[in-house]
Regions:
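Catalytic cores of carbohydrate-active enzymes
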Residues: 244, 363, 370-373, 414-523, ...
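Glycine-rich, acidic and aromatic/proline-enriched surface loops and short helix-turn segments
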Residues: 248-256, 300-308, 572-579
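Non-catalytic C-terminal accessory modules of carbohydrate-active enzymes
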Residues: 46-76, 83-87, 497-507, 512-520, ...
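Carbohydrate-binding/catalytic loop surfaces
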Residues: 256, 260-273, 311-330, 334, ...
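Aromatic-rich carbohydrate-recognition surfaces in CAZymes
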Residues: 109-110, 131-134, 143, 205-207, ...
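Inter-helical turn/loop segments and adjacent helix faces that build the functional surface
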Residues: 223, 338-350, 419-436, 490, ...
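Terminal accessory carbohydrate-recognition/targeting modules of carbohydrate-active enzymes
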Residues: 1-238, 242, 269, 291, ...
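Carboxylate/His-rich catalytic cores and anion/metal-binding grooves
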Residues: 215-251, 280-285, 290-300, 489-502
Length: 619
């Protein structure tokens, strides 16, 4: 579950909502139950509505944003409203691991008797759809402790709306028609809906008094709401510097199911838990902020999913796209990072069996789309269906049809073989160690023969029956950044220099060089236009993490100041796009606007991991 909106509380996306929850009884999507809660200040019979909605015809109502005097989110989002002599503070916090939003209203100042009125706007719809006025929606509600519960449609959970203070609920059902979401308009989607308001809550408030509102799929003890809110605020990391913003963002990707399984969400607001994203982001989101325990919890769930896949059993975990051919390779990389943090002995004890099983599974050629060829390289078919992280499709076909020998797959494979060979030696499994070393040697030799070209960079993918792909893409950086590289030091430096000249931006690496054909750096416009641009020049911060790791590997401390300057581009982003986090991607040309999902796990993770690497190289 999540809560998401703009700082003036005007929803601009269909994904926005005050309480957005999964409803597994219906489908695998999140659903907006409570779209917004409009507060109205009443004094001497005069009403001042603090809400804000955009309606068709570019009309905004009731324009409550004009009363906002301050906004900050150092710990939790806090808005200060001034209406004449009334000063009202609103603080919002989402209860960790619960489907509950809490809002605390504090009357900071008032010179007359003051009443607050709260009008909830209900949607009860999927984040992928809109709702409109209809006769099917139920208007029934039941009174609960200091509030009500209601449910608009069968199959949905009840929505409990409760306050910490006694109040009067006035049943006055109505539909607010033509609410419009401009960001959906920009993307060429349907953009308006109708929202249902069952009535309003009303209560008096004294100067200095605080009232807590709770919206959830379960009832709460209203006597505990004040303490519950205070406890949640106490647990939050302050956003008082760049690092703390990232730590706070990292925790937002933590996901726990009712079965107590632990996952990493790929991003907000529309991404689920994806296998590749999980393993790439897991080290940065946990190990880089000294949270090894959560790494182990996620890996416990992920390991179960990996074994189910490798053993051909029905998949029971909620980690999607586990069948993608490079997922197993990224799992090895994630465990490799764990070993560097906790020591190889503990890592071997916990994960040696999983590592060996993954390597043996690949060697046995059991992965349906990861075939080990006689030259020691891995081959994947990606012409008809995208199989790498560059997975955008248009008209049913991959925009970037990466197929054959894919550069990062084979860099990861070489790294995995070398890492597991060392592990096998440490465990006394000399025969396995020798086999892994032999395969790594063959893979490394073939890698150089296959991918290195006369211009000093690497082919992105090579289909033996076709000409190699000459596009300059960032995937070659992994062959430099990984602990074990099949390239010579001179070749590594050459690859890094090409990435620096043609791909580096203040927001990460471009997905395609401006000198290559098909360069399209602007991620704007309708869906098809964005699909074609997705991996054709846009900049990705998570790739920048591996670039900076490669820089430190090749140039050591001499590049520290350069990398610190690069990090400024991400620090600036803390007050852009989505406050306190990093979005999915950026335009590949200045001014490098943030685009896509408002918060992306791999980006946050790799920036955190880069900060950690900087500290290690400094000392």
């Amino acid at each position: 579950a999540y809560s998401c909106s703009t700082i003036v509380d005007c929803n601009t996306r269909k994904y926005h909502g005050l309480l957005v929850v999964p409803v597994p009884e219906l489908d695998d999507e999140n659903h907006v139950l409570l779209s917004s809660l409009d507060a109205t200040v009443i004094q001497h019979g005069a009403e001042f509505n603090l809400g804000l909605h955009k309606y068709q015809g570019n009309n905004y109502s009731p324009k409550g944003h004009k009363y906002i005097r301050e906004f900050d989110c150092d710990k939790v989002p806090t808005t200060l409203y001034r209406v004449g002599g009334v000063v009202l503070k609103k603080e919002v916090v989402f209860q960790h691991y619960e489907d509950r939003i809490l809002i605390r209203y504090t009357l900071v100042d008032a010179h007359s008797a003051t009443t607050l009125r709260f009008r909830p706007f209900l949607a009860f719809r999927s984040v992928r759809q809109f709702t409109h006025e209809n006769t099917v929606a139920s208007r029934e509600y039941s009174e609960v402790e200091k509030g009500i519960k209601t449910c608009m449609y069968a199959g949905y959970p009840d929505l409990y709306m409760q306050f910490s203070k006694d109040n009067k609920f006035v049943f006055m059902p109505d539909w607010y028609r033509g609410v419009e979401y401009p960001k959906e308009q920009e993307r060429g989607y349907a953009s308006n809906e109708d929202l249902y308001v069952p009535g309003y809550f009303e209560m008096n408030i004294e100067k200095g008094e605080s009232i807590v509102f709770s919206a959830s799929t379960s009832a709460c003890d209203t006597a505990e709401l004040q303490q519950l809110f205070a406890d949640e605020v106490e647990e939050r990391s302050p956003r008082d510097n760049f690092f703390h913003c990232l730590v706070n963002a990292a925790h937002q990707f933590h996901n726990r199911t009712k079965k107590d399984e632990r996952y990493i969400l790929a991003g907000y607001p529309w991404f689920k838990c994806r296998a590749r994203d999980t393993f790439i982001s897991l080290p940065g989101l946990t190990l880089s902020i000294e949270e090894e325990d959560y790494f182990e919890l996620v890996m416990e769930t992920a390991s179960r999913g990996l074994y189910e896949f490798m053993e051909g059993k029905p998949l029971t975990t909620k980690m999607y796209e586990i069948e993608q051919p490079d997922v197993l390779l990224w799992a090895v990389w994630a465990i490799q990072q764990y070993a560097k943090h906790v020591g190889r002995e503990k890592c071997n004890r916990k994960y040696s069996k999983l590592l060996c099983d993954i390597i043996d599974y690949i060697i046995a050629d059991k992965q349906p789309n990861l075939h080990l060829k006689d030259n020691g390289l891995l081959y994947s078919e990606g012409k008809e269906k995208a199989v790498t992280w560059m997975n955008s499709t248009a008209n049913g076909h991959p925009v970037v049809p990466r197929t054959g020998y894919i550069v990062e797959f084979n860099a990861l494979w070489y790294n995995a073989l070398k890492f597991c060979a060392v592990m096998a030696t440490e465990l006394g499994a000399d025969a396995e160690a020798a086999e892994y070393e032999k395969r790594a040697e063959l893979c490394g030799s073939s890698f150089v023969d296959t991918f290195v070209n006369q211009y000093g960079y690497l082919f992105d993918y090579v289909e033996p029956k076709d000409n190699p792909d000459w596009s300059v893409r960032p995937n070659m950086i992994f062959a430099v950044a990984l602990d074990y590289s099949p390239l010579s030091p001179a070749q590594q430096k050459s690859v890094l220099d090409v990435c620096t000249r043609e791909l580096l931006t203040p927001k990460g690496l471009r997905s395609l060089s401006p000198k290559s054909g098909g360069y399209n750096p602007m991620y704007v416009g309708p869906q098809t236009q964005r699909d074609y641009a997705y991996h054709q020049g846009t900049a990705w911060p998570w790739l920048g993490g591996f670039y900076m790791e490669a820089c430190l590997k090749i140039y050591k401390r001499t590049r520290l100041s350069f990398i610190e300057r690069q990090m400024v581009g991400y620090e600036d982003e803390m007050v852009q796009h989505c406050v306190g986090t990093i979005p999915e991607l950026f335009d590949g040309n200045p001014p490098f606007h943030g685009r896509g999902a408002i918060s992306f796990a791999m980006n946050v993770a790799e920036v955190l991991r880069t900060l950690e690497l900087l500290e290690k190289y400094k000392y």
